[in-house]
Structures are given as structure tokens and as C-alpha cells.
Amino acid sequence: MAVQKSRKSRSRRDMRRSHHRMEIAEISIDATTGEKHRRHHMTKDGFYRGRQLFKVSQDA
């Protein structure tokens, strides 16, 4: 197994982890319903880019 020669400093550790942050989700507002949804995802009503792709039942 590989064993490090010397301990890494907090600065080096944190610089390595600087890319591990959480990204903020891109939010869009649907033109037809005005509902907020994630980019490139359809809304809960079944609309995507102004067209209804699926008919969603109201049972759920």
C-alpha cells in the first residue's frame, strides 16, 4: 500500500477539496403554467418547452 512521506497541510487539503462544493440547481419558470422547474426537466404537469408530453392524473 502507498504511504505518504509527510502529512499534507490544511491548505493543500482544502485546495484539493475546493472543487467538491455543491452546485446550485438551475431553476426555470415554465411559460405556460408559470411553475418553477429544473432546467431540461419537465414540470409536474407534464409540460416541457411549452408542450404537454404526458397527461398527469390527479390521483397522486
From Swiss-Prot:
Keywords: Ribonucleoprotein, Ribosomal protein. SUPFAM superfamilies: Zn-binding ribosomal proteins. GO terms for molecular function: structural constituent of ribosome. The keyword Nucleus does not apply. The keyword Amino-acid biosynthesis does not apply. One of its GO terms (biological process) is translation. GO terms for cellular component: large ribosomal subunit. Residues 1-22 are annotated as: Disordered. Pfam families: Ribosomal_L32p (PF01783). Residues 1-20 have a biased composition (Basic residues). Disulfide bonds: none annotated. Belongs to the bacterial ribosomal protein bL32 family. PANTHER family: 50S RIBOSOMAL PROTEIN L32, LARGE RIBOSOMAL SUBUNIT PROTEIN BL32. This is Large ribosomal subunit protein bL32. It comes from Psychrobacter arcticus (strain DSM 17307 / VKM B-2377 / 273-4).
